[in-house]
UniProtKB/Swiss-Prot annotation:
EC number: 6.3.4.2
Protein name: CTP synthase
Extra facts: CTPSs have evolved a hybrid strategy for distinguishing between UTP and CTP. The overlapping regions of the product feedback inhibitory and substrate sites recognize a common feature in both compounds, the triphosphate moiety. To differentiate isosteric substrate and product pyrimidine rings, an additional pocket far from the expected kinase/ligase catalytic site, specifically recognizes the cytosine and ribose portions of the product inhibitor.
Domain of life: Bacteria
Organism: Rhodopseudomonas palustris (strain BisB18)
Subunit annotation: Homotetramer.
InterPro entries for this protein: Class_I_gatase-like, CTP_synthase, CTP_synthase_N, GATASE, GATase1_CTP_Synthase, P-loop_NTPase
Lineage, top ranks: Bacteria, Pseudomonadati, Pseudomonadota, Alphaproteobacteria, Hyphomicrobiales
Pathway where it operates: Pyrimidine metabolism; CTP biosynthesis via de novo pathway; CTP from UDP: step 2/2
MF terms in GO: ATP binding; CTP synthase activity; glutaminase activity; identical protein binding; metal ion binding
Length: 543
């Protein structure tokens, strides 16, 4: 039977509950336990698929096509266990399911209320299909005190009472701010946060205290006394130099030992931290460095590209180099020459995005990379813009454009009206809803024998990658573009949808319709990112 660990947050948002959950899961996993991580989001959206990247950050897509919170990316990267649509739920989804049942008459005329109907739905989600795991870690989004989070806190309060004694614990992540004028860490915000939790019936078992310095023994004692936890359960969560040092830091602070003690479990053995030690050694002592320009639309919000920046870091780990990121707003290139911004970089990456804003800037970035022989990696929208650039400047199709931006005489990129999903054919139109209507999840692609991308994948001729797009390169232009050197080296199994393009006479120029960053891990860097960074290393030696 699985045991449950509920991770809550207090004082301020963005403290790192997702990283804390992922790191704790990795520590338990390294001790030989099977873990599952789930995220409960209190917002009313059905999923983050249509939310602004500036508000929510990245949308993380799973193999089974769920659009989820970016924290699931942390879970996958730290534990290696692929997340599914069953690992993320929102208030909006819960309400939709409840109201659908109410319309069908499933509740037999009962009055639908937050308690018990909403809380029961949350409990069912948390407790479902966990028999194969030793620990289930559930992160509650937001902070204690948020109105929209109250049903979730009530649900996890009930779960601890419903389960046998010792089968569930609460870990509360909080902030210990340092006040320079007073010269001390302040515990009062944490005390008030715990007071708020206790007022709704939840007593934390462990306090995980974010701080930039060591917690003095007296402050640790005070926290234990006023928050009603053991002094040993006041865990110091010190700031670290990179996120992959978090498991090491939490283990050194005794978090995993304290969790097992809270369950009354004798530790099986010390966790196997060798792989984490190797990764952090490479990060802290690189043998060189490269600079990659990310030319995107949402560069003001780094979390919009969370998996992307982490995948580039993984590429650096694979090549034992530090990857410096130069974030450039693509709109800049619509009015200015890209050369002054890009001449110093060793690689250019144009990521995914939606809409016309900044598109011409991405096209100019692709042109610069092609003409200057700078390694170029185009992902999703970045591949589409590279194809439009080739059509305009190599194939002489001056009007080449995407129907996403409006009607065009030369639709190099157009809306996918239908595609196969398993054994079913899905169809879309311009008039349809935006939410949940993209080509989502893992799809296969066939690679051309002898192509660069096949070589990158170790000679593979078939791959599976995650997608999130509703527009696709038009295969009607394939022959004309290939005559000018742009090779369509990857296609869907039916040959209809272009998946990968590349230039054979370029040091490294690859565009992919999928999102390889979603499957990259620190221990298993995605081959495309490892190869891209390797090409950037070669380019850096030529400058």
């Amino acid at each position: 039977m699985a045991r449950y660990i509920f991770i809550t947050g207090g004082v301020v948002s963005s403290l790192g509950k997702g990283l804390a959950s992922a790191a704790l899961g990795a520590l338990l996993q390294s001790r030989g336990y099977k873990v599952r991580l789930r995220k409960l989001d209190p917002y009313l959206n059905l999923d983050p698929g249509t939310m602004s990247p500036y508000q929510h950050g990245e949308v993380f897509v799973t193999d089974d096509g769920a659009e989820t919170d970016l924290d699931l990316g942390h879970y996958e990267r730290f534990t290696g266990r692929p997340a599914t649509k069953a690992d993320n739920i929102t208030t909006g989804r819960i309400y939709q399911d409840i109201l659908t049942k109410e319309r069908r008459g499933d509740y037999l005329g009962a009055t639908i209320q937050v308690i018990p109907h909403v809380t029961n739905a949350i409990k069912e989600f948390i407790l479902d299909s966990n028999d194969a795991y030793d620990f289930v870690l559930c992160e509650i989004g937001g902070t204690v005190g948020d109105i929209e989070g109250l049903p979730f806190f009530e649900a996890i309060r009930q779960i601890k009472n419903d389960l046998p004694r010792g089968e569930a614990i609460y870990v509360h992540l909080t902030l210990l701010p340092y006040i320079p004028s007073a010269g001390e860490l302040k515990t009062k915000p944490t005390q008030h946060s715990v007071k708020e939790l206790r007022s709704i019936g939840i007593q934390p078992d462990i306090l995980l205290c974010r701080t930039d310095r060591e917690i003095p023994k007296e402050e640790r004692r005070k926290l234990g006394l006023f928050c009603n936890v053991r002094e040993s359960a006041v865990i110091e969560a010190r700031d670290v130099d990179n996120i992959y040092a978090v498991p090491e830091a939490y283990h050194a602070a005794g978090l995993d030992d304290e969790v097992l003690a809270a369950f009354g479990i004798a530790p099986k053995a010390e966790p196997d931290m060798i792989s984490w030690n190797v990764i952090n050694e490479r990060i802290r002592n690189p043998e060189g460095q490269v600079t990659i320009a990310i030319v995107g639309k949402y560069t003001g919000m780094k979390d919009a590209y969370k998996s992307l920046s982490e995948a580039l870091s993984h590429g650096g780990i694979a090549n034992k180099v530090k990857v410096n990121l130069d974030w450039i707003e693509s709109e800049v290139f619509e009015n200015e020459d890209p050369a002054p911004f890009l001449e110093h970089v060793n690689g250019i990456l144009v990521p995914g995005g939606f809409g016309q804003r900044g598109a011409e800037g991405k096209i100019r970035a692709a042109q610069f990379a092609r003409e200057r022989n700078v390694p170029y990696f185009g992902i999703c929208f970045g591949m589409q813009m590279a194809v439009i650039e080739a059509a305009r400047n190599l194939a002489g199709i001056a009007a080449a454009n995407s129907t996403e931006f409006g009607p065009t005489k030369e639709p190099l990129v157009g809306l996918m009206t239908e595609w196969l999903r398993g054994n079913e054919r899905e169809q879309r139109s311009h008039a349809g809803d935006l939410g949940g209507t993209m080509r989502l999840g893992a799809y296969p692609a066939m690679l051309q024998r002898g192509s660069r991308v096949s070589e990158v994948y170790g000679g593979a001729l078939e791959i599976s990658e995650r997608h999130r797009h509703r527009y696709e390169v038009n295969t009607a232009y394939k022959d004309r573009l290939e005559q000018h050197g742009l090779r369509f080296s990857g296609l869907s199994p039916d040959g209809v949808l272009p998946e990968i393009v590349e230039y054979e006479d370029h040091p490294w120029f690859i565009g992919v319709q999928f999102h390889p960053e979603l499957k990259s891990r620190p221990f298993e860097p995605h081959p495309l990112f490892a190869s891209f960074v390797q090409a950037a290393v070669v380019q850096s030696r030529l400058v």
